[in-house]
Amino acid sequence: SAADLEATLAAAAAARRPWARTAGGVGSFMVQVAKGMGAKVVVGIDVNAEKLARMRDFGADATINPREFAGKELKERFKAIAKEAGVSANTGWKIFECTGTKPGQETALSLLSFVGTLVVVGYGTDETSYMLSKLMAFDAEIIGTWGCTPDKYPAVLEMCLDGRIQLGPFVETRPMSQIQHVFEQAH
């Protein structure tokens, strides 16, 4: 629920926990939110080099392209990044899966470990297999969320106003005469 997400974000910020996330269209915003809330390390994961560069531009400490590092290699790269940053690679990570794709979900699930939290943000229709007893063994949790509640809007607005979240690079102004074309492009 949104309340669970808010609790997770608050706990992560308070503990300055590291964050991992698999990207998508929301990726650069999630990186900014994580950094804005004080995450010690943010790792962005995406198959698109432009999105990875954008995440680095907006605060990701490291990025991983699953096309370059697949399966166990990706996990090893993730561990190396954590070691370089001086944080545990398998304890307490907050993972945000934003793509909604089966590969993104599988990557996120593969990184979930001890006292970690996976927050599913991206919507997808593919089924994914996961051994639920791992949640018990890892004392981990998986949360699904659609967004935050209106009472959190002031905090988000504050991060936008003080520059922790940059909106300008994501906004494009077009004349009203193009509204039909823009709508068609967006849908």
Language-model segments: residues:
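Short loop/turn segments at beta->alpha junctions
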Residues: 70, 100, 175-178
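Short amphipathic alpha-helix with an adjacent loop that forms part of the alpha/beta core around
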Residues: 70-90
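Mid-domain Rossmann-like dinucleotide-binding core that forms the NAD(H)/NADP(H) cofactor-binding site
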Residues: 1-69
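C-terminal hydrophobic helical "lid"/dimerization subdomain
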Residues: 83, 106-107, 150-187
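Short SAM/SAH-binding signature in class I
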Residues: 91-96, 116
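Short, well-ordered coil/turn residues at beta-beta hairpins
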Residues: 66, 96-98
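Glycine-rich phosphate-binding loop and adjacent beta-alpha segment
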Residues: 38-39, 56, 61, 99-164
